[in-house]
Amino acid sequence: KKKIHTWGLEINRVTLPNITEKFMNNLPGAEDELENTATALRIFAEAGVPIARQRLAGDTFPQLMTRYQSVHRGGYVSRGESRALTRGELETPNYDELQEWWNRFCDIYSTLVPIAEECGIKLAIHPSDVPNPDTPLGGLGFHRVIDAFPSRSVGYLYCVGTRAESGGSSIVMDEIHNYGRKGRIFMIHLRNVRASLATAEAFEEVLLDDGDMNMFKVLLELQKIGFDGCLNPDHIPNIEGGSSGLAYSIGYIRALLAALAAMP
């Protein structure tokens, strides 16, 4: 943290140690994983980090998707995912398996949430990416999380791109309004995509100005609900020249913020 401060920066969010299949399937050593992540949460809170994210095994169904490289304007390359291209028998967890996953999730949050409340750090959940139907942290899943854990320390690392993969820009605007007015959006992953699982059984990640969403409208909606957290450019496409994609994304976000500030 001290080194980051020497560069004039602040830590906005950290990722806790992963909860793997070992814990989610209740295998030997499972409790060690939970103890490890609980200890890490306390340490980050003591260091003054405001937000922590917990990643969990089993919240996506990668076997349903075929990944490919998509090429876009000027030759830049990005991730594409297609359900339509996937061949063979596609198995997903049944109801009992999904319920067991949820029970294990509740075990984790029942441990972490009291620590977060005591230590003054927020727990931010990222939606399931790819958001296939019945993924545990999809559109219904997050409602389930905040119903089970109504603490103000529990909220969303809201990923605009992931949720657009589910059903386009309309779902993003609705969810920002819904979760934002409840104070549940702690941080934003800002990413644009083309198509969605609902419209094409596929999607492709693109630069912020090159997808289906109007990112200015997204920021305008965030302003309306009073969001004042961090905007994180996410899954940056590869532009020839190393860090050019990151520079382009940051520059574009700064331009959007300047335009927003100039509005009467």
Regions found by a protein language model. Name each.
Residues 1-106, 118, 162, 223:
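Structural motif corresponding to the early beta-alpha repeats
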Residues 5, 23-25, 34-35, 42-50, ...:
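Histidine-acidic metal/acid-base catalytic patches
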Residues 54-59, 127-129, 234-236:
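Short, well-ordered beta-to-alpha junction loops that form the rim of enzyme active sites
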Residues 91, 98, 128-131, 204, ...:
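Residues at structural and domain junctions
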Residues 105, 123-129:
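Short, structured patches in soluble enzyme cores that scaffold and shape functional sites
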